[in-house]
Amino acid sequence: MKWLVVKIVNPRNGETLVDPCCGIADFLSLSFVNAVEKQKDWQLDDANIYGVDLDESMIMLATLNMLLNGDGEAKLYCKHTPGSILTKIAVGDTPTLVDLIPDRHKGGNWHDWPDNTKLMQFDVVLTNPPFGEDRAYRPSTEQDRRIIEMYETWSLAGNGDNIDLGVVFLENAYHVLKPEGRLGIVLSNSIASINRWQKVREWLMERMRIVALFDLPPNVFAETGVNTTLIVAYKPKSSAALKKLIEQEYSVFVRDIERIGYERRTSKRNVFFNPVYRIDETTFEVMTDKDGHPILEEDFTQTIADFRQWALGQEETLQCLFLRET
């Protein structure tokens, strides 16, 4: 699934990339590998790759993951709870971590600083934040509340008690993207569908050009069992540019992903992931590619091809952002 996100959003040479909930940095490492595979001189500059996580052990594993994939310069930061909800990356000769100031940065106004601090904005945000009712942000202290009040979506959709962390990181992604920056974010399907988050969806559509929605089966994230949606979008250069797209009733690529190439099995409380291969309907044998390797029964490859074909018929900005190879 993470390959799908990387192939669709298409990070490339010269761009900055961040995952504010990086875990073991799969999105970051796959983006680096994907760029290297295209051509040698096209690869991402590993010094332009950033990740933040609140778990120190995750950052250690992320560092190892990046090193094993040939990236030894990615900037990976551990910042304990509340992590990148409060802490951002500031511009500088050496980028540094800075904390938002609750009294100055309420409601998403994050650019008002008492000094010359300037937050970094990125070309690409790829992330799979924590989400769901059991992972909601629940302010238990006055400081917790002051922190979450720096997010506009808290006043829109927070019920005074909690807000889905997926919503918080959706807003975070918007703020840290450059104009014409691209987003790939995996959220609970409920954020894209139920009434409670209607105002969040409206907030997003008033600020970003939704490019694609991919509904994913629950076993993609076996540890949660939650149905998820991948949202792909870009941030137009101006509100006027977005308004024009809305007036033109822009198109959104929508796809249900059903076949993922493996099945989950449980035996004696142990979870196993068994590959599922494509079967020839005539011979009932496992199909193989030109190199003799078995072909997985998955929808990702065709979905990527279909998306790229669809994108050829969209506005020039979208084509440039998602299809350009250099």
Residue ranges and their predicted role:
Residues 102-326:
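A conserved structural/catalytic subdomain of Rossmann-like adenosyl-cofactor enzymes
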